[in-house]
């Protein structure tokens, strides 16, 4: 999980080239109650971070490249450097990576985290809805992403949640990414604006009209948009199967 192929460059956990928010603003505290902060102990024993989001009381959705030896999820957080009264810290019982995940091509970059216990749903901890399996977001639509990643190539990761509004791009805008697949991925962020997810933001959501349509996956190692997000609608049947224990 080192060097997100930003992925290895852009969206891995912060130490691995993961993404953060560039060109955004600090989110209003607890305005995104589905957001999850992932503290990851890698297979090598180092510490990384990713984002994720709560889709059921006992399940967090994130990117497969955020896998690790051990993961602790913090829900209800705004400033992850503090022990806020709203926070719920829950260890991950099981990491469920899509069986077709390909780290070389950055495809099927999706993972479900089953928590050791159900989260208590509160005004600051809540789930976010997913799209239907046939729901595609059209190019030109404006959506949001959020995370605790870096705010610049040479900047540290953010301790407070940040957010940025991004434009959904036509697939041609991501043609520089050799293995980009429109059916399974979303091209996000105009190349004319320095706004994107960046290192440390990996696994966070792409939010369109209150629905999670994407997962931060990878992009340019220097944080230049567009970036690639996993298209959630393509995986809705798999997600439902895992959550329902089938």
From Swiss-Prot:
| GO CC annotation | extracellular space
What residues are glycosylation sites in this protein? 102
Q: What is this protein called?
A: Mast cell protease 1
Q: Which residues form the propeptide?
A: 19-20
Q: What residue intervals traverse the membrane?
A: none
Q: So what EC number does this one have?
A: 3.4.21.-
- Which cysteines bridge via disulfide bonds? 50-66, 143-208, 174-187
């Amino acid at each position: 999980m080192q060097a997100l192929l930003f992925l290895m460059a852009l969206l891995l956990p912060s130490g691995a080239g993961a993404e953060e928010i560039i060109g955004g603003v600090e989110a209003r505290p607890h305005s995104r109650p589905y957001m999850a902060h992932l503290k990851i102990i890698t297979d090598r024993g180092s510490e990384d971070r990713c984002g994720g989001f709560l889709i059921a009381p006992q399940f967090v959705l994130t990117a497969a490249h955020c896998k690790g030896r051990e993961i602790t999820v913090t829900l209800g957080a705004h400033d992850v450097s503090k022990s806020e009264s709203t926070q719920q810290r829950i260890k991950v019982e099981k990491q469920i990576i899509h069986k077709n995940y390909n780290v070389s091509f950055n495809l099927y970059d999706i993972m479900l985290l089953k928590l050791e216990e159900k989260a208590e749903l509160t005004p600051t901890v809540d789930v976010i809805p997913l799209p239907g399996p046939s729901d595609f977001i059209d190019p030109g639509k404006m959506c949001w992403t959020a995370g605790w990643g870096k705010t610049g190539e040479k900047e540290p990761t953010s301790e407070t949640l940040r957010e940025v509004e991004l434009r959904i791009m036509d697939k041609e805008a991501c043609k520089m990414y050799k293995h980009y697949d429109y059916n399974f991925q979303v091209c996000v962020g105009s190349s004319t604006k320095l706004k994107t997810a960046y290192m440390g933001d990996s696994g966070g959501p792409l939010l369109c009209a209150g629905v999670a349509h994407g997962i931060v996956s990878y992009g340019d190692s220097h944080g230049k948009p567009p970036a690639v997000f996993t298209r959630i609608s393509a995986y809705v049947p798999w997600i439902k199967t895992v959550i329902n224990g089938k």
